[in-house]
Amino acid sequence: TLESLNDMVRSGKVRYIGLCNLAAWQVMKAVAISKANGLARFQSVQAYYTIAGRELERELVPLMEDQKLGLMVWSPLAGGLLSGRTKRDGAAPEGTRRATFDFPVVDKQRAFNCLDAMQPIADAHGVSVAQIALAWLLSRPVVSSVIIGAKTIEQLNDNLASSNVKLTSDELRILDEVSQLPREYPGWMLALQGGYRAAAPTRD
């Protein structure tokens, strides 16, 4: 497969190649094989990533940053859940994507906590909650592009306007804190070790 993709790049049929929905070890294996054999390597990863679904940060984001891979985000509003139309104590409104297809999988409690934090920020900027969710994504260094799934012209225009929203450092801190993932091993051990190493040595 990698040789076939390489042939397509070398012949000019495609400019860059990317992959989608793979584990970090699979991505790294493909990159390493391409490098070892002088083949065109993957340049991008297409993956699910939202303020309410940051699992990608455990393994894939560090890998992409290290290997200089761009991230193309799919379902940046978690299947419409982060548009703000669905309320914490109610079902998804009729006609919305979530009403007929409850996908992608998301921790709804975390999602609604994020929505609660995004609403006052959206009000302060005079924009929709959806724009804040997209602006947060666009602020992430690893994100190269966001694949939006608007159903109407109004939704499309609203989504596109998110590129003009500039979140302040305080706003980003609030959003990062409310959406932060709990550390799992080896993450908490690496953080602990990093703290020890960063501490200045003391002398008697």
Which residues are covered by each model-predicted region?
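Glycine/proline-rich, positively charged
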Residues: 1-59
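Conserved, mostly hydrophobic/aromatic
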Residues: 17, 45, 64, 71-74, ...
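Active-site-adjacent beta-strand anchor residues
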Residues: 20-21, 75, 127, 146-149
